[in-house]
Regions:
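P-loop/Walker-type NTP enzyme "switch/lid" segment
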Residues: 2-12, 19-92, 166-171
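Short, well-ordered beta-strand core segments
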Residues: 78, 100-101, 127
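Beta-strand-loop-alpha "switch" segments that mediate conformational coupling across diverse proteins
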Residues: 135-137, 145-174, 187-192
């Protein structure tokens, strides 16, 4: 099974979401858990080299061919961290995904980029938005939630803006962040049954 973490826009929280989802999967007892890093920048791989997460195996797959092989060549749970902007690779990956988590931010140009991402996902594939680095209680967040709800796009999570999560590999995984991403993972996996 593969859970794709995808958005054609960069800087929205794909790598952070991928690492936290993989750690949440291990905590739920999934074995093996692969974090498939499809981004040529290899940010997930670098994160796990600096701060390994016990039970998570990193697989670098920066080309369409290696990504297809990685997604089909395992019998566990794959969390796939995708690159921004490579629409051909994203199209290929979404067609092989069992569920798609779409990290985004509240407001601005985010909506149009998520819509492009949604158009790539086959109709039968469960998908949901995760609003990352959310500033709780703001108009931007309220408007984003209202907009996605009106578009009938499930919101699988709202991850509050926190220094502990934003610190990335420089810090240990933030306990509250793990709990929030566990809820996202449950929603993604529930849609695959």
């Amino acid at each position: 099974m593969n859970v794709l973490v995808s958005n054609v826009k960069g800087g929205v929280g794909k790598t952070t979401s991928s690492v936290y989802l993989a750690a949440a999967a291990v905590a739920r007892g999934y074995d093996p858990v692969l974090l498939i890093d499809a981004d040529r920048q290899a940010s997930s791989a670098e994160w796990l080299e600096e701060r390994p997460v016990e039970g998570v195996t990193i697989v670098e797959a920066p080309s369409e061919r290696t990504l297809t092989r990685a997604m089909s060549g395992h019998d566990g749970l794959g969390i796939v961290d995708t690159p921004p902007g490579d629409e051909r690779l994203l199209q290929s990956a979404t067609s092989a995904a069992d569920a798609v988590v779409i990290p985004t931010r509240a407001g601005g140009v985010e909506f149009s980029r998520v819509l492009v991402t949604l158009e790539m996902i086959p109709a039968r594939t469960p998908r949901g938005v995760v609003i990352c680095a959310a500033r709780l209680g703001t108009n931007d967040l309220a408007e984003a939630i209202a907009w996605w709800t009106a578009q009938k796009v499930p919101i699988w999570g709202v991850i509050p803006e926190r220094v502990g999560i934003a610190a990335g590999p420089e810090a240990r995984l933030y306990r509250e962040g793990l709990a929030e991403y566990d809820a996202v993972l449950r929603r993604a996996l529930r849609g695959t049954r």
